[in-house]
């Protein structure tokens, strides 16, 4: 079986390193630190400036290959159910993670979210079952589709959706989505395994991490 590319190599570890000198972590440079983390000769806990939540997020991302499900590379779309899914009892201002409705994308995203106790909503937009990278290529993930998907899913008591987090491949939709909705929109990482790093203290790891 040919495995789908989950873009683990696109995780931007450098972005989340402490602003201090990486030599405090036992490496000669920050690039050397990342190499050491990836080959296992260094550990996130070697960095005294990294807070506990970031140590856990680094450890998680570094182990993503063994955590994520094996997904086959299919040429044809495999549509799953679109719609809004709630994780960990979200409240009115809990962020909404936007994704596509590929069955395999849904499996990967929900696997990652199984490792947090933080509240989120996930909006699986009907993009004909394309994975997000293909949905942007084929223009099946659009501002209008996201807007229509959200139209009937307003969080109770909030009056409006406060914050959307787009997948990294959908960066070009950020500005037009803000202009159309007036909502707060952020562009998240390309690889979903980077979410714990990207969200920082807003991502609380489940027990054991």
Residue spans for each PLM region:
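Immediate flanking context of iron-sulfur cluster ligation sites
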Residues: 7-23
């Amino acid at each position: 079986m040919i495995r789908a590319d989950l873009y683990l190599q696109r995780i931007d570890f450098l972005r989340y390193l402490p602003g201090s000198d990486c030599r405090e972590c036992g490496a000669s440079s920050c690039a050397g630190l990342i190499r050491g983390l990836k080959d296992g000769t260094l550990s996130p806990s070697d960095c005294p400036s990294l807070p506990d939540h970031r140590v856990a997020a680094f450890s998680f991302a570094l182990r993503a290959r063994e955590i994520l499900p094996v997904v086959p590379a299919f040429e044809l779309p495999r549509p799953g159910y679109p719609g809004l899914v709630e994780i960990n009892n979200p409240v009115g201002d809990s962020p909404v993670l936007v994704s596509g409705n590929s069955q395999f994308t849904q499996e990967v995203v929900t696997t990652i979210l199984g490792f947090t106790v933080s509240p989120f909503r996930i909006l699986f937009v009907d993009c004909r079952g394309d994975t997000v990278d293909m949905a942007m290529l084929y223009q099946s993930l659009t501002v209008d589709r996201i807007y229509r998907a959200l139209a009937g899913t307003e969080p109770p008591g909030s009056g409006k959706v406060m914050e959307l987090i787009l997948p990294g491949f959908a960066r070009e939709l950020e500005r037009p989505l803000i202009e159309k909705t007036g909502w707060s929109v952020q562009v998240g990482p390309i690889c979903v395994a980077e979410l714990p790093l990207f969200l920082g203290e807003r991502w609380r790891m489940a027990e054991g991490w």
